[in-house]
């Protein structure tokens, strides 16, 4: 029997152990999609206590606490931070089988040297020990990033964001690359009651008077250029329902004017607007050499009562089960026909879509860029041992796992980088298992290179973040 969380955690063969410890363990991290605050990074935010660092904004933990019968006062409500921590400590032993149990103890060990298993009995002792450390030098937001051997962080930013903290971090010369990610969801959500207000904000941010759909597109392009100047090389789209409708820019011009004049739109008109706008964005990304991420099939804000009380991103989302194959194919094909399909990473929250995504990705590889079309890593509810394994097994069966760009945190917490360790261990265990079964040769040179690629080097090559340094160097010269 193995000891819990020992050096060989999740590594179930000698080959897996060798691959992890010799090839994966010490590689830098490229976290190409997260929800960290660039302001917190710039200010090297410190934390009053472990509750602030751990439980503020973590809807994974909130869901578990609610499922354990913890009242909302002790989840997101007005209970003290100490009482919220006690409620979490009471919940932790009940999370066995859930990755939260592993992540919790990995984070305690890696960042705070706490070997004990958190529970209700030792909660006070751990509270005091961890909080003492948090008051020491070297436990701010930047410190957690640097301790985790992170090379690049890509945040999630709205087109109207000023990017002032990315700029300040670059000017200051912070050793970790902190780059913006372009997330234009509000610009495509024409059905939202606040769309008109957002258009006015976009006009202000871009310094373009938006009187027409063409003006709207010009404003988005201006913001894309602004993001590009600030080092952005990645876009991201949350697509809860994958849709597609043939249309023309002239027709969408009419739809845009109708919406801005206060008239309701039909469902087909909404889809036509999204389709045409998305195609324009894809073209713009391709022109600038960006990668495009599509996060598909989330069913959000399901509990109306709690949404009205707490707002979005509070733990009341689920997997959607909309069909994605045909509309996604038509979007990709339209961009491909126009020679405007950027490097693309496809994620679905529903694991039944794994095979769909892997096969669709294979339909649009270009024979030039290794792994141009990526089946993205297991996401959100699939960010588990089972989910990660299934995603990698599907990818390896249908595509080239050797060209996979690997893991990201998708997190709002500065303690989440242990998820990269978790992923790397699972990756090495999968490949090690193939070796043990005689399904692949025991060729450490080959397998080690593949492990290094998936863990770090493929993402570095795929995104080419070094271009940012060249861009900024040129801007200084000019």
Swiss-Prot record:
Molecular function in Gene Ontology: glucuronate isomerase activity
Gene Ontology biological process: D-galacturonate catabolic process; D-glucuronate catabolic process
Keyword set, alphabetical order: Isomerase
Pathway: Carbohydrate metabolism; pentose and glucuronate interconversion
Pfam families: UxaC
Catalytic activity line of the entry: D-glucuronate = D-fructuronate; aldehydo-D-galacturonate = keto-D-tagaturonate
Top EC group: isomerase
UniProt cross-references to InterPro entries, sorted A to Z: Metal_Hydrolase, Uronate_isomerase
Coiled-coil ranges (or none): none
Full protein name: Uronate isomerase
Organism encoding this protein: Bacillus pumilus (strain SAFR-032)
